[in-house]
Structures are given as C-alpha cells and as structure tokens.
Amino acid sequence: MKMYYVYLMRCSDNSLYCGITTDLYRRFREHTNKENPKGAKYTHAKEVISIAAAWQTEAGRSEASKLEARLKKLTKEKKEILCEFPERLYEFYSGEQVFISIQIQPM
C-alpha cells in the first residue's frame, strides 16, 4: 500500500494549513512555489513558511482523509499543541492508531 502523510504547514500569518499527500517534501515545494503554484487557494493567499508537524500511515487514503478532517476541526490551540508534541495525536484523534509522527527535516 502507498504511504500517506497528513501535515500541518505554518503560514506567514502564523495560521496552520492541514492537508494530505503521498510526498511530503514535494507538497511543501508545491505550496511554496509562487511561479507555478499547485498549492491550495488558502496557501496562495498566505505564504507557507514551514512544515509544522506531520504523520505518516500505510493504512491508505481513506484513513489519511479521516485524520485530515479531524485536524481541520481542531481549535488553533490544539493544533499548536500537536505542532509542539506530534506524538500526542491520539489525545485529539480517536480513529485507528495507524499514524506515526515523523521528524521534520529542515527545508
């Protein structure tokens, strides 16, 4: 099965954007490429500056989409907790425990 990533990206206004992808660093480049933007409308208006947190799973797109939907409903305060402590994901998500927090490499 394909590896999926669910991520939180920090924008220049300190907001957090949530999404899913099969290639985390390619997706970051797409969100930050101003000349050929393939990112979401939200990130066109607000410059993405970093990957704040990310989780990976081999459980498929459906599971990744469920987590993405749950993260989008969290308050900013709870998202900030996850950015600082991504391993605390299951305090905020009651779905299957198929996600592993990953160490973000500097861009």
Mark where each language-model region is:
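Structure-specific nucleic-acid interaction/processing domains
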Residues: 1-18, 22-107
